[in-house]
Amino acid sequence: MKQMSVVADSPVHSSSSDDFVAFLDNELGASSPDSSPDKEAESQDELESVRIKRRKIESIDETEGSTSEGIIKQNLEASVEVDVCTHPGSFGSMCIRCGQKLDGESGVTFGYIHKGLRLHEEEISRLRNTDMKSLLGHKKLYFVLDLDHTLLNSTLLAHLSSEESYLLNQTDSLADVSKGSLFKLEHMHMMTKLRPFVRSFLKEASKMFEMYIYTMGDRPYALEMAKLLDPQGEYFNAKVISRDDGTQKHQKGLDVVLGQESAVLILDDTEHAWMKHKDNLILMERYHFFASSCRQFGFNCKSLAELRNDEDETDGALAKILRVLKQVHCTFFNKHQDDLVDRDVRQVLSSVRSKVLGGCVIIFSRIFHGALPSLRKMAEQLGATCLTEVDPSVTHVVATDAGTEKSWWAVKENKFLVHPRWIEAANYFWEKQPEENFIIKKKQ
Amino acid sequence: MFFHIVLERNMQLHPRYFGRNLRDNLVSKLMKDVEGTCSGRHGFVVAVTGIENIGKGLIRDGTGFVTFPVKYQCVVFRPFKGEILEAVVTMVNKMGFFAEAGPVQIFVSNHLIPDDMEFQSGDMPNYTTSDGSVKIQKDSEVRLKIIGTRVDATEIFCIGTIKDDFLGVINDPATV
Ligand SMILES: [Mg+2]
Ligand SMILES: [Zn+2]
């Protein structure tokens, strides 16, 4: 017998109701032209065909009377209702407002909220506007947080250095992650260390912000990390954006965040991921707990884990940034001269930043040409005045070598002589750093 | 809506299942194969309720497998446009809310939530009437009307509305 067997998963005469079967068939023909019965073939050698040919539905009236249930009448009403709908978005390729099937894939995908959800630009801006009012009413702003090197550090288990292998015996239980900070995620072949202070940080920040996670990691990783940071789902529920959700490769954008740009703060260690939103960004000092992470960024030093050390819990990077957040939040809501909706957190951020090195007059001495422009820009954003010629008003000489003419001048005139890292540290911690920690030694 | 219908399927059985338990083996394989699956045509097969008829088996050359045409009764679930469904809210956000009726995913956008209900953010986001008497949040049970369905090979998506009389919350988890 060479003939293939043919299976028909199709309604045949039912003892219960022929009407239903006919109705079902009509309805199916009318509403799912795309679902071919072939898709149902699930077994390799089974070929399915439907015996009952789909009746062509000329008009909705044909379904009338095919059943005694009230459903047909409702069905009729729903279908006849001709609405001029702008189709603000779609779910499962149906309009979220009128239910009509839509062709094509226009609009922005919001897969991080729910599979199959898309919204159009106008709808996004409508949602942002209404949300903005209610959020400001609650004295909150938006806060977009990066994961890697900002809130935590992860490594593949295989990349643990020999000096780090002691960590394998020190991981915290996954049964109650809220108590731990070092986790082995066997199924992902990974180990993750949360940054010190991160739990207090998130708790405090959640009082001031509606928070999103935005990572260049993939979706499963992002969700796994969100579970470690937020086991109760209080902070990031349906607000975890991964690289699978972005609209541009290797870039993060606020287009998938349902908040107005004028009310969004971003915390990330990677500045170039946010080309379009630098004014919203609080740049984070990188957290390198694992050796693999140091290597990835070209550092030849020992990792925190190898040194059996860690950032300070109460005065580390996150604690310092929390103080900045509080200051920005407070400034945003406490100045009373204009309407809340007209305020821009980017301006507040830049004004807070410009006070960090306020009053400092800086002159650079023999800084590598490539580094100079960005260093100068950084200093100016922090409120310092940068000069090119020595002048009695100069307060700081920034150099890498104590033997330059300007360095000698600084010593002679009793000015501060500091390493460029003094500016970078002020930029990370939003605070003028003690100059004595950035003294430069004379080169031999 | 649930339907009790008769479907037919050709079941292939390995010779090791032959013998006096043949019928039982066929039935349990059938249940394993079809229950919980979704077909674009009929919706979700909820349960096999009975066997109408098992036809004569056809032995296939070479393999020794035998194909039996089996007619079986089953309960299927398939939502329709215009149908009123009761569903459990799974997620609430500023766009609206998502709900589930069994395996069916339903989205009710805020365009289709009554205008007097406003979104409240927070750790338990919800839609609440201005007087606070009605609240939709996660785990609320709602009665909604389906205005669009899309049945794929493996999934069913629906668009729902509660902007009509007698629709909305039927059981608020916060009050029980
Ligand atoms: Mg990062
Ligand atoms: Zn529409």
Swiss-Prot record, chain B:
This protein's GO CC annotations: P-body; RNA polymerase II, core complex
- CDD domains membership: RNAP_II_Rpb7_N, S1_RNAPII_Rpb7
Molecular functions per Gene Ontology: single-stranded DNA binding; single-stranded RNA binding; translation initiation factor binding
Q: Which InterPro entries match?
A: NA-bd_OB-fold (IPR012340), RNA_pol_Rpb7-like_N_sf (IPR036898), Rpb7-like (IPR045113), Rpb7-like_N (IPR005576), S1_domain (IPR003029)
Entry's transmembrane regions: none
Q: Which domain of life is it from?
A: Eukaryota
Does this entry carry the keyword DNA-binding? no
The record's subcellular locations are:
Nucleus
What Pfam families is this protein classified in? S1 (PF00575), SHS2_Rpb7-N (PF03876)
Please verify whether the record's keywords include Transcription. yes
UniProt keywords, alphabetically: DNA-directed RNA polymerase, Nucleus, Transcription
* Biological processes per GO annotation: nuclear-transcribed mRNA catabolic process; positive regulation of nuclear-transcribed mRNA poly(A) tail shortening; positive regulation of translational initiation; transcription initiation at RNA polymerase II promoter
Tell me, what does this protein do in biology?
DNA-dependent RNA polymerase catalyzes the transcription of DNA into RNA using the four ribonucleoside triphosphates as substrates. Component of RNA polymerase II which synthesizes mRNA precursors and many functional non-coding RNAs. Pol II is the central component of the basal RNA polymerase II transcription machinery. It is composed of mobile elements that move relative to each other. RPB7 is part of a subcomplex with RPB4 that binds to a pocket formed by RPB1, RPB2 and RPB6 at the base of the clamp element.
Q: How does it assemble?
A: Component of the RNA polymerase II (Pol II) complex consisting of 12 subunits. RPB4 and RPB7 form a subcomplex that protrudes from the 10-subunit Pol II core complex.
In the record, the note on similarity to other proteins reads: Belongs to the eukaryotic RPB7/RPC8 RNA polymerase subunit family.
The protein depicted here goes by the name DNA-directed RNA polymerase II subunit RPB7
Q: Species name for this entry?
A: Glycine max (Soybean)
